[in-house]
């Protein structure tokens, strides 16, 4: 902008982004992509205990013996007050705790403050996120899927209801075009193998099928929920319950093949946090 010539031939430009989906195609095509995985909950906990807590205590003038934060409190902060791939939000929460502790020491004469999972809301307020745990019992038409987002792995319940009707197929839950097409592929596959599961040939003409993925305000997209939707539909149609401690992920084809998926590490960690004991993934 100062209209001076600059030789950029030897310059290495390094750019970062939270999601590649927001980068324009022509720009992305000229870049060498290096993907960095999000931190796990365990890694975040270690970063907090070894670096962030000490940093925030020093910034707020708190001595080592004046503040103690339990391991369970740190875990609750990570799961219930932040939803991120890094630790910026976690550091902000720890900063809020340190500032409130400093005020308690100065105004209330407290000599030391202990933060636990029981009094955490006193420091940070009501929980912002509710981590969905595994269902307590096996249910018909409800299957747990796994998602990979820009902030890490997540689990999502897929619900299917079957009711008398005229063959209507409905999808709700703020689904994107790719996920809708995946659902259509799943229902087509089930119809093609209906004889194998003793499903009446006229069933799909005499009944409506409704697929819903809760948290309708949150946009959802991607093909990897195909096998989950197919399983949920088959469960609802046959009346066979699905194990509550099982989650699955994979794109399904019209021939029933399950294609490879991404983000397996993040998805597996999300399943473990949610209390899922078995994860079904594509063989390849």
Regions found by a protein language model. Name each.
Residues 1-9, 38, 235, 273:
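Substrate-engagement module of ASCE P-loop NTPases
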Residues 8-11, 28-32, 243, 275-277:
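Short glycine-/polar-rich loops that comprise or flank the Walker A/P-loop
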Residues 70-162, 166-172:
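Conserved catalytic-core segments of large NTP-driven translation/proteostasis enzymes
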Residues 15, 33-35, 213, 248:
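Structural signal for conserved beta-strand scaffold positions within catalytic alpha/beta enzyme cores
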Residues 19-29, 33-95, 100-113, 193-202, ...:
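Conserved C-terminal "switch" segment of AAA+ ATPases
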Residues 133-135, 139-144, 152-284:
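Peripheral, non-AAA+ core regions of ATP-driven protein-machinery
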Residues 1-17, 67, 207:
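AAA+/SF3 P-loop NTPase mechanochemical coupling elements
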């Amino acid at each position: 902008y100062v209209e001076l010539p600059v030789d950029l031939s030897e310059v290495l430009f390094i750019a970062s982004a939270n999601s590649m989906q927001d980068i324009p195609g022509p720009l992305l095509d000229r870049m060498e992509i290096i993907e960095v995985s999000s931190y796990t909950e365990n890694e975040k906990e270690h970063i907090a205990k070894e670096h962030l807590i000490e940093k925030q205590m020093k910034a707020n003038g708190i001595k080592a013996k004046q503040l103690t934060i339990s391991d369970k409190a740190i875990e609750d902060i990570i799961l219930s007050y932040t939803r991120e791939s890094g630790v910026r939000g976690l550091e902000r929460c720890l900063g809020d705790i340190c500032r409130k502790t400093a005020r308690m020491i100065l105004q209330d004469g407290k000599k030391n403050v202990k933060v636990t999972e029981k009094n955490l809301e006193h420091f940070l307020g009501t929980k912002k996120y509710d981590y969905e745990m595994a269902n307590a019992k096996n249910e018909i038409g409800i299957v747990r899927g796994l998602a990979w987002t820009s902030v890490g792995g997540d689990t999502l319940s897929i619900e299917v209801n079957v009711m008398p009707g005229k063959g209507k197929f409905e999808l709700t839950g703020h689904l994107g075009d790719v996920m809708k097409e995946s659902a259509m592929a799943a229902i087509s596959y089930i119809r093609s193998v209906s004889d194998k599961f003793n499903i009446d040939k006229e069933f799909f003409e005499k009944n409506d099928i409704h697929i819903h993925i809760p948290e309708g305000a949150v946009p959802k997209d991607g093909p990897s929920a195909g096998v989950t939707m197919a399983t949920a539909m088959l469960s609802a149609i046959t009346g066979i319950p699905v194990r509550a401690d099982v989650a699955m992920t994979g794109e399904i084809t019209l021939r029933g093949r399950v294609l490879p998926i991404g983000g397996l590490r993040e998805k597996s960690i999300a399943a473990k946090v949610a209390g899922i004991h078995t994860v079904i993934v594509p063989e390849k």
